[in-house]
Amino acid sequence: MRRLDLNLDGGIGNLLFQYSAALKLQNHFEFKVSLKELSPGLIKRLEKYVGEIEFSTSRFRSSSHFAQTSNLGRLTTKWEPSFSPCETHYSIRVRFLKGYFQHPSWYQDSLELVLKKLDTHRESASLHMPRNLTAIHLRRSDYVRLGWDLPMSYYDKALAIDSNINQGPIAVFSDDQMIVDLFEQRLSAAGLTIHNNADSVASSAFNDFFTIANAQRVIMSNSTFCWWAVKLAQSSNSEVVAYCPSTWLPDQKSNVLIDSTWIKA
């Protein structure tokens, strides 16, 4: 069985896609896959969400730790473009695999298993959730610099589409607290009820993820974090309504991430 080292890199959304790709490579192509984190703490973060990992793992070590051997020098790293289909054959020289693996052919075969692993935490979080919750997620940070952040007009349009939103509380999530505060002020001024998740549980990306996964409707950002939370929500409740942007990212190939059941706003 050929060995293949798959690199872990990025936030939890990217890590879940990489984990799904590793399952595909091992279960369908019979590679012996090892997961290697490119920065410290990524394996621990992934395990927090999915529990025990079925692969051997390699913790982060600085590049100066490694001595290049003649054997490793003949092996190569293959970069998989984010939205490219899964390949069925790799050169014998390919030993290291990098990428975000966001084409359905990479994750579809293992999606049910990954969602099942995530669902344990969703069920626990559901005990603290109000009924008929609407979750709104805004991705900022590096998206602002890259020009990928979604305009307020998208969120306003999604809010205007659904007349049932005012029947329950709204929770706003983002990696930018200032944006959360400003958005909540806008919603309050419009007469909508704000649910402050921090009142019931310590705020963190982990708790935000599973709160979104328990919402009745979600106005999504174009992030993989929100993508996975919505997939988890709809896997356990087919009545969950999700609103998404009409184009995921400027790269048109990214639209493969848009589910046919989501409502474009």
Locations of regions flagged by a protein language model:
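Short hydrophobic segments within beta-strands
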Residues: 7, 136-137, 173, 245
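Donor-binding and catalytic core of enzymes assembling or modifying cell-surface/extracellular glycoconjugates
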Residues: 12, 166-252
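Secretory-pathway luminal glycosyltransferase catalytic domains
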Residues: 38-167
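Short amphipathic alpha-helix
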Residues: 18-25
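Leloir-type glycosyltransferase catalytic cores
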Residues: 248-265
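Extreme N-terminal starter segment of soluble prokaryotic enzymes
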Residues: 1-5
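A short, glycine/small-residue-rich beta-strand->loop->alpha-helix junction that serves as a flexible
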Residues: 7-17, 145-147
